[in-house]
C-alpha cells in the first residue's frame, strides 16, 4: 500500500462510470485506500471529477461544497422519467413554431440567483432513511421538500435547433451553480416555464475546485503515469480543495495560534501591522489578512502561511466576531 501520496487529481470521468467506480479503480491503480471524490456525477455525465488522495481526503467536505460549472444540452418537446436522455418518455408536447430564442433567454435569466428546487425522484437524496431512486424503482412517487440552491449564471450557448417533424427544440447551455443543484431538473423546470415538457439531453462538468476540463486526465492515462513513477507531476496541491473559500494569509504569530487550534477574534487584529506572505496564489482566490475579517461574507475561510494551507476557520455559531478552527491541517 502507498500511504504517502497526498494531493488532488483532476480526473476526466467517462460516460458509463459511476463516481464510486472511479474511486474504486484509482484505489487499485494508486495502491492506497485514502481516496475520495469531490462531487458525484451521474453515470452518463462526463467531465471533471476532483479526487482527493491521502491527507487531502480530510478536505473532501469543502470540495463537495464548492460551486461547479457545467455545459450541456436541453431538449424541449418531451420529458423522461429520469429527466435525462436515459429515461423512458413520460410526456410529449410538440413545440410550436413561435418559440423564440429571446423567450428562451428570458426564461433562463429568471432562474439566476437563489431559487428553490425539488430534487428528482431518480436521485440519491434520502427521505425517511431511503434513497429517492429506491422509491422510484418501486414505482412510488413521494413528496420531496424543495431545497435552496444558487444559480450564478445560466445562458444559452448555441442557436436553437428545430426538428419540426418531431416538434423538438434543442440548444446548448452553460450553468454555474452551487452544491446540490440538479442540472437535469433545471432543464425540466426551464422547459416547464416555457409551457412544454423537456429534459437534459447531454451534460459535462467543465470546472470544479479550480480544476478545468482541458486539464482533466482519463483513468487509463493516470495508470500509465503511475506506472512510469511520475504521478507527482499531475497531483495538485491540497489548496485546490478550498478554492471556493476566501484565503487569509497569516503572520508568524497568527500561524503559531492556528497550528494549536486557537480562535481568532476580529477585534484582536484591527490595529496590527500585517506582514503575511502572499507571494503565490495558484488558485486565484481573493486574498485577505486577519484585519479584513469583517469584510468576509462567507461562513468559512482558508488560512495560509508561507503559501501552505494550514487550517480552515469558521464563524463561531454563538459568539459574534469570533472565528474558530473547523479543521487544522498542520
Curated annotation (Swiss-Prot):
InterPro entries: PsdUridine_synth_cat_dom_sf, PsdUridine_synth_N, tRNA_psdUridine_synth_TruB, TruB_C. GO terms for molecular function: RNA binding; tRNA pseudouridine(55) synthase activity. It catalyses: uridine(55) in tRNA = pseudouridine(55) in tRNA. The active site is at residue 42. The keyword Metal-binding does not apply. SUPFAM superfamilies: Pseudouridine synthase. Keywords: Isomerase, tRNA processing. Pfam families: TruB_C_2, TruB_N. PANTHER family: PSEUDOURIDYLATE SYNTHASE TRUB1 (PTHR13767:SF2), TRNA-PSEUDOURIDINE SYNTHASE (PTHR13767). This is tRNA pseudouridine synthase B. It comes from Lactococcus lactis subsp. cremoris (strain SK11). The lineage of its organism: Bacteria, Bacillati, Bacillota, Bacilli, Lactobacillales.
Amino acid at each position: 500500500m502507498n500511504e504517502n501520496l497526498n494531493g488532488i487529481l483532476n480526473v476526466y470521468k467517462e460516460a458509463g462510470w459511476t463516481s464510486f467506480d472511479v474511486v474504486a479503480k484509482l484505489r487499485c491503480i494508486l495502491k492506497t485506500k485514502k481516496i475520495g471524490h469531490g462531487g458525484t456525477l451521474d453515470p452518463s455525465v462526463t467531465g471533471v471529477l476532483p479526487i482527493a488522495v491521502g491527507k487531502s481526503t480530510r478536505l473532501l467536505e469543502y470540495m463537495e461544497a464548492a460551486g461547479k460549472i457545467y455545459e450541456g444540452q436541453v431538449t424541449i418537446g418531451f420529458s423522461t422519467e429520469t429527466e435525462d436522455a436515459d429515461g423512458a418518455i413520460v410526456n410529449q408536447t410538440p413545440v410550436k413554431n413561435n418559440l423564440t430564442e429571446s423567450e428562451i433567454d428570458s426564461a433562463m435569466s429568471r432562474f439566476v440567483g437563489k431559487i428553490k428546487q425539488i430534487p428528482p425522484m431518480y436521485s440519491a437524496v434520502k427521505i425517511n432513511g431511503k434513497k429517492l431512486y429506491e422509491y422510484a424503482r418501486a414505482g412510488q412517487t413521494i413528496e420531496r421538500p424543495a431545497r435552496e440552491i444558487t444559480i450564478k449564471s445560466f445562458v444559452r450557448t448555441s442557436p436553437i435547433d428545430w426538428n419540426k417533424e418531431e416538434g423538438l427544440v434543442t440548444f446548448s447551455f452553460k450553468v454555474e451553480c452551487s452544491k446540490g443543484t440538479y442540472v437535469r431538473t433545471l432543464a425540466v423546470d426551464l422547459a416547464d416555464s416555457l409551457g412544454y415538457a423537456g429534459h437534459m439531453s447531454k451534460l459535462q462538468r467543465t470546472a470544479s475546485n479550480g480544476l478545468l476540463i482541458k486539464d482533466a486526465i482519463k483513468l487509463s492515462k493516470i495508470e500509465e503515469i503511475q506506472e512510469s513513477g511520475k504521478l507527482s507531476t499531475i497531483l495538485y496541491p491540497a489548496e485546490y480543495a478550498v478554492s471556493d473559500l476566501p484565503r487569509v494569509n497569516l503572520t508568524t504569530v497568527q500561524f503559531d495560534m492556528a497550528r494549536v487550534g486557537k480562535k481568532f477574534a476580529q477585534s484582536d487584529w484591527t490595529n496590527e501591522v500585517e506582514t503575511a506572505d502572499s507571494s503565490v496564489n495558484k488558485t486565484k482566490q481573493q486574498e485577505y489578512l486577519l484585519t479584513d475579517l469583517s469584510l468576509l461574507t462567507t461562513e468559512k475561510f482558508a488560512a495560509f502561511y508561507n503559501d501552505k494551507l494550514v487550517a480552515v476557520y469558521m464563524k463561531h455559531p454563538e459568539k459574534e466576531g469570533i472565528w474558530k478552527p473547523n479543521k487544522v491541517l498542520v
